[in-house]
Amino acid sequence: MDPNCSCAAGGSCTCAGSCKCKECRCTSCKKSCCSCCPVGCAKCAQGCICKGASDKCSCCA
């Protein structure tokens, strides 16, 4: 179960404007999502929908 989503790990879910899923894929954007995308973040660059730049990116920690 994804801690930030109501879906199983590796499963799919629907995300509205803000996607916080880490272990599942969002059907609304067809791929994994990051809430931020700082420069040099390899994980965010690999298929994430970036919502905005930030130095504090939980998906890239």
Swiss-Prot record:
Keywords: Acetylation, Metal-binding, Metal-thiolate cluster, Phosphoprotein. It comes from the Eukaryota. A divalent metal cation 6 binds at C37, C41, C44, C60. The modification Phosphoserine is found at S58. GO terms for molecular function: zinc ion binding. A divalent metal cation 2 binds at C7, C13, C15, C26. InterPro entries: Metalthion_dom_sf, Metalthion_dom_sf_vert, Metalthion_vert, Metalthion_vert_metal_BS. Pfam families: Metallothio. A divalent metal cation 4 binds at C33, C34, C44, C48. A divalent metal cation 7 binds at C50, C57, C59, C60. A divalent metal cation 5 binds at C34, C36, C37, C50. A divalent metal cation 1 binds at C5, C7, C21, C24. The modification N-acetylmethionine is found at M1. A divalent metal cation 3 binds at C15, C19, C24, C29. One of its GO terms (biological process) is cellular response to zinc ion. Residues 30-61 are annotated as: Alpha. Gene3D superfamilies: Metallothionein Isoform II. Residues 1-29 are annotated as: Beta. Class I metallothioneins contain 2 metal-binding domains: four divalent ions are chelated within cluster A of the alpha domain and are coordinated via cysteinyl thiolate bridges to 11 cysteine ligands. Cluster B, the corresponding region within the beta domain, can ligate three divalent ions to 9 cysteines. Metallothioneins have a high content of cysteine residues that bind various heavy metals; these proteins are transcriptionally regulated by both heavy metals and glucocorticoids. This is Metallothionein-2. The gene is MT2A.
